[in-house]
Design a protein with these regions (language model features):
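Conserved phosphate/metal-binding and DNA-contacting active-site motifs used
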Residues: 1-182
Length: 185
């Protein structure tokens, strides 16, 4: 995480609940702190903070809520097969996936719902990272050859996707992000 310059923090084992007192506000890039956490809690899950501070955001696709169909429809509407973009993608323990992009320099991406089956993980959010274990016992993993530790860089999001995400946030009003759904994967 430190090499990737992403903010991380520990989650309770096989959980999406923060292990530290202040949750994502305790997130760090500091290698010594990261080593201390996982030495103390070797079975802890890993959370990656999303948003401007980490320099990334993610689309969180959940098939249990129609996410695969929503994602296909989104790709069709944008005229872009988003899964073919060379950017990190992780498989979630619930059978969904996270598609990671560079956080844009000039726009704000807030966490929220894009559709019933797709969450936006931006400012105020986090995702459970690969090498974690879902509450159902399945592991999170990097998809194929999209592991950022193997050199895959965050791609910029397509401009059509950014326009949709920024428009969605504007239509929802400039409110403080809610954390009610932050642990949904």
């Amino acid at each position: 995480a430190e090499a990737l310059n992403w903010l991380v923090f520990p989650l309770k084992p096989q959980s999406k609940i923060p292990l530290t007192q202040h949750g994502f506000k305790d997130a760090t890039r500091n290698a010594d702190q990261i080593i201390q956490w996982w030495t103390q809690y070797p079975d802890a899950n890993i959370a990656i903070v999303t948003g401007a501070e980490s320099g990334l955001f993610a689309l969180d696709v959940d098939p249990r809520n129609g996410g695969n169909e929503d994602f296909d429809q989104l790709s069709t509407e944008l005229g872009i097969n988003l899964q073919l973009i060379n950017t990190p993608q992780s498989l979630t323990g619930s059978g969904g996936f996270h598609l990671f992009f560079q956080y844009p320099a000039t726009q704000v991406i807030r966490s929220g719902k894009l559709s019933a089956g797709i969450d936006i993980k931006g400012d105020g959010g986090y995702v459970v990272a690969p090498h974690s274990i879902h509450p159902n016992g399945r592991a999170y993993a990097w998809e194929g050859e999209s592991d950022p530790q193997e050199g895959i860089m965050l791609a910029p999001a397509p401009s059509k996707l950014l326009a949709l995400l920024v428009g969605k946030a504007a239509s929802q009003g400039a409110t403080v992000p809610t954390y009610r759904n932050q642990w949904v994967d």
